[in-house]
Structures are given as structure tokens and as C-alpha cells.
């Protein structure tokens, strides 16, 4: 996640340059640190597919869960990160979102619908920021002033798409027409298919239907390699010039068997990747039992940069795969939730608690989403959104039937709550706004990160027990949800269950 704001966008809105420059300084700046995960159903205990993402941005940064209503034809999507605009030619769909606070976006309430499910059962997690190489940049340069970007991906996908494939195809058409303003990866799913969509350069893109017998972990690396058949439209969709453009420009790369290598052609080189990224990759592979070997697959190094703190972390000997097979099957909902809190505790030299390295369960997590998809179920109930609005190392994921929810728990602070509590350094004597689970979890994690060896240990044990309780309770809710056959009845139950789970978590 980058969160960049070009000056031209402020000019376009008629704001003076002097004010615009000051505003930019107060807005979020580039933050290339998120971790995306996927676990195919063949490896899970319940036979469900799971995917999600941890967003990293700042130690105390407020996020909001809410519902965007449906709109009449003519609804306009726009952005202040670029000049992108799109007007819908049909009624839009209601969807859930996780968004930023308006105070960080000039009062805009639509910034970054990064995780949600729409009323048709389409879900998405957006975005994982990536990078492209110099040759791709020279051939098809990304102009940050124009094109579709992470400010709008989620809103467009969820507001417009009745299936995951529709979402993929719509993004592709928009990129063909307007280009993109950033390199990103997005996961889009429904009750039948899960797709990984990647923007490769300004106008080149690829989408791959994810298999049931693989896992995936990506900590912002655009060059993780994969094998894909570009001539199989059932499982792969892509821009028309994905291969012909780099061939014409002279930078196309091919594997040893003569197959066009998408990741190597467009992705950043190994030399341009960073130790913070590879540390998370090694930590994640270890968590999933598909370990890399220090001294063979990677080394632990310290990078010194002029004027910046030293960075200690992992650097691999060669580019690693985007997809792998975990070391076991039977992954549980709890284990997959906790994967986002992984701090490398079992990796010698890459334990964030003792070795000063970056990690997946970072103190800079702001929001974590995990989608549990039951293949073939009715789209209204097929997907459960497990949502954490604070740092995964010391947080709890709340289960939400977001395709049906129309009433958000009052314990989820809406976008009218003050952002000021994020700036507090002494959370013991500065209480959070009343009935705000967003701030409660933020404050708990702040205290635990300050006291990891004392408070952190006991709180994590308590939160684990609470998380398991939520998982077990939701099985009872799910049985009732599946027994209900009407949309009205399911909606009432989804609203009631979401409010109860949120309030109970807040109270406990």
C-alpha cells in the first residue's frame, strides 16, 4: 500500500498550490509494506479456501468497517490519487468496506475500500503494492497522475461486479483504456473462483485463477515467479500486449523451456528487492512448513544506507516462487488468522522480537482481512469476512457475513469519530472514544508492543482464547444462517450476529 497523492490531483480540484503542498505533507506517504496470503481448499481442515492481506502503514492509524449502499445508474467513481474517473451505466451493488479516515483525505469518505464483500457475494482484498523493472518502465511508463489505482480498485470491483470474473474483466478494460497509476496485486473471489490480478506496467496486466492445491505468500515482491498458460482463458486473462509489447521493445524474458516468463519480464530484479520484503517471505514460508534454508536459499545481511537506519534481514540467492505447497494439510481458521501475527519467532536470526528485523505481524499493521470461502454455497452466505482493525500480533478477527450486512455495529467507530486519539503516546491516561473497538484494539496492541515480555505474553494468550471462542460461536451462527432460506431472514441474522460478535469482543 502506497497512499501517494500527486500535486496535480489537488490542482484539478481547484486547490491552491501553497495549500496543496501543505496538505500533501500532512497526508499519508509511500508505504510499501503489506503481506498477501492464499491457502487453497485442499490444505485446509474445513475444505474452504482462504485469502487475505495485512496492511502496514503506521503504528497508530485508524481504519473503519462500513457499508456502501447501492446507487442508481450514473454513479461516478473518482480518485484524488490520480485523475481516474468512471461512471457506472447500471445500478451499483451494496458492499462492505474497510476505509481510511476522511481527515487523511481532504474529507473524502471513499478512500481505499480495501476489503469487503458485495451483495452478490464477490469479495476482494486490495492492494498489495509491487514494483516493475527499469525496462518495463521505459517501455510502458506508469504515470502517477492518471489511471486506475488503489484508491479506487475495491470500490470499482465491489460496486460493479456480480462475479469475480466480471471484476477481473472490468479492471482489465479500465486499464486497457486509462492505464494504472501504481503497480499492484489484488485478489478477487466469489463462491466458485478466486483470482489473483496483477498490474504489470501502465497498460499490461494479468489475472490467474488460483488453484486448490497451492498456497501463496507475497510481501510486496513483483517478481515472485509463476508458471502460467497465456492461451488458457478459463484460468488466465491478460492484456493483449502482455508478450508482444516486451518482444517489440526488446526486453521479453523466457524460461529454460522457452516459455514466456511474465514475472521475470516485468518484475523488479533481485538487486532491487529489499531485506524487509524477503524477511517476511522467509518468515511466512517457515510458518507454513515450507522452510527455506539459511546459507543456501538465503543469508541474513545488514544493509547500510546513507542517512537512514541500518536494515537487517534476509536476502535470497535467487527469486522465489509465488506459489508453493505447505508442509502440512489441515490448516484451521485459527492458524490462518494467526499467520498474519507471525513475527518470525521460530526463524533463527529473523525473530522480530529479538533480532530487530521486519516481520509480517508488524507494529505498523493497520488492518488485516481474511476471507473464508465455501465453494458452491449460495453467494449470500458463501464467504465470511474475518476482520481485524488493528495490529495482528495483538488483535482479534471478528466474523462478518458482509454480503448481507446492512447495519454496522455501533462498536465499530464510523468515519465521524476523531482521528486525534491515533496521536496519543500515553494510552493509559488518555482513554479512547467511547464504544470504539477500533481504538480499543489499537491501544491494547500499543501497550503490548511496549511490554512484550510481560503484558504481551499474557494478553496474547487471552486473545487466543477469545479468538477460538469466536470461531466456535460462529459455527453455531453459521448453522442458523445456512438453515435460513430467505434473503430477509439471512440479512436480519447477519446484522444481529455481526453486532453481537463485535460487542462481545469489545466487552471482553
Description of each model-found segment:
Residues 2-17:
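Bacterial N-terminal signal peptides that target proteins for export
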Residues 21-31:
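C-terminal segment of classical bacterial N-terminal signal peptides
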Residues 34-150, 170-310:
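A contiguous strand-loop segment
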Residues 154-160:
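Short, well-ordered beta-strand elements within core beta-sheets of diverse protein domains
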Residues 167-176, 337-340, 344:
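Short, well-structured alpha-helical segments that form the helix of a local strand-helix-strand
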Residues 285, 290-354, 358-363:
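Accessory, solvent-exposed terminal regions and/or long lumenal/extracellular loops of proteins
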Residues 345-469:
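Substrate-recognition/cap regions that form aromatic- and gly/pro-loop-enriched pockets
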Residues 449-508:
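Histidine-centered catalytic/metal-binding microenvironments
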